[in-house]
Amino acid sequence: MPAVLSSVLSNITDFVVHEGNGVKGLADMGLEALPKQYVQPEEERITTSTVIVDDTIPVIDLSEWGSDPKVGDMNCEAAEKWGFFQIVNHGVPLEVLEEVKAATYRFFRLPAEEKNKHSKDNSPSNNVRYGTSFTPHAEKALEWKDFLSLFYVSDEEAAALWPSACRDEALTFMRNCDAVIKRLLKSLMKGLNVTEIDGTKESLLMGSKRINMNYYPKCPNPELTVGVGRHSDVSTLTILLQDQIGGLYVRKLDSDEWVHVPPINGAIVINVGDALQILSNGRYKSIEHRVIANGSNNRISVPIFVNPRPNDVIGPLPELLESGEKAVYKNVLYSDYVKHFFRKAHDGKETVDFAKIN
């Protein structure tokens, strides 16, 4: 083993986390075996025995949304029964999708010292964060992923703080998704018989946004690790753009079986987050999902997390309780909920139980 590689493997946390090389830095060294720090327990790896190959999440064509009320009904049904669905003919131009994917590659191809300017130790703002894995300090086994996380405050702050390699494309993607986000949330509220979205509800549903750029390098021994471990999102909705490589798996409702989310050119994946599960009193389901590592290809994805504001209190919507439903969840300060999620390793649906009424 070359001396440089031997030195890196003996100080992986420094190389990957503190020096900003990420797992891309490891992959670029041509590793032939997965470092032990990334070997996941067997129960956290996906196996062929737990995957259903002839089933997948719904694909909903939005082209007739304005004229066919069934389209809105299909969105609500998918949110209830799957918590995940893909949308096509959504109005976001294909070139916008392609440009933000290209910008993601452009950022991660920057030298490590350039990317590391945005790390937890070096970034001038908590709203811009480059990192690796999920919570390296809390994980027994690391995840095979690097990421850039950008919390949106204003165009002015983005212009000042977001990396120039991907800033404009990230903002354009977010802006182009705004109309479909609002329409989806309005449709999902209608399914709960909530007909008016006032200022308070608008804040609860979409008061803040974060866009991530995820990079999953080609991996030696991909069957021993994960790109992302089992989790559900803390958002109201997540709007996900994935590339053509594949690897996203979703747990079927009330099952231990998983289905693959096949890439569809031009499609956007939508999933319900914990905040919407709580607001809907459990009607809409925030579902566990995970990403496998790939031994042949690099993979990217670009999620937009649509969230309440940090100082919002989330709980079942009053309209649901007024109609006689019993509250399944207590009221929780959203920032407390998010802190609970980020202080530990990925652990399936444990976070939403934090808000359950016992």
From Swiss-Prot:
Q: How is the cofactor bound?
A: Binds 1 Fe(2+) ion per subunit.
Biological pathway: Phenylpropanoid metabolism
Q: What is this protein for, i.e. what is its function?
A: 2-oxoglutarate (OG)- and Fe(II)-dependent dioxygenase (2OGD) involved in scopoletin biosynthesis. Converts feruloyl CoA into 6'-hydroxyferuloyl CoA.
Name-wise, this protein is: Feruloyl CoA ortho-hydroxylase F6H1-1
Key words, A-Z: Dioxygenase, Iron, Metal-binding, Oxidoreductase
Keyword Oxidoreductase set for record: yes
Q: Write out the GO MF terms.
A: 2-oxoglutarate-dependent dioxygenase activity; metal ion binding
Report which reactions are catalysed by this protein.
(E)-feruloyl-CoA + 2-oxoglutarate + O2 = (E)-6-hydroxyferuloyl-CoA + succinate + CO2
Identify the domain of life. Answer: Eukaryota
A Pfam family of the record is 2OG-FeII_Oxy
Q: For binding 2-oxoglutarate, which residues are annotated in this chain's numbering? A: 216, 299, 301
Family per similarity comment: Belongs to the iron/ascorbate-dependent oxidoreductase family.
Residues bound to Fe cation are 231, 233, 289
Example GO biological process: response to molecule of fungal origin
Extract the coiled-coil ranges from the record: none
The EC number(s) this enzyme carries: 1.14.11.61
Which InterPro entries does the record match to this protein?
A: DIOX_N, IPNS-like_FE2OG_OXY, IPNS-like_sf, Oxoglu/Fe-dep_dioxygenase_dom, Plant_2OG-oxidoreductases
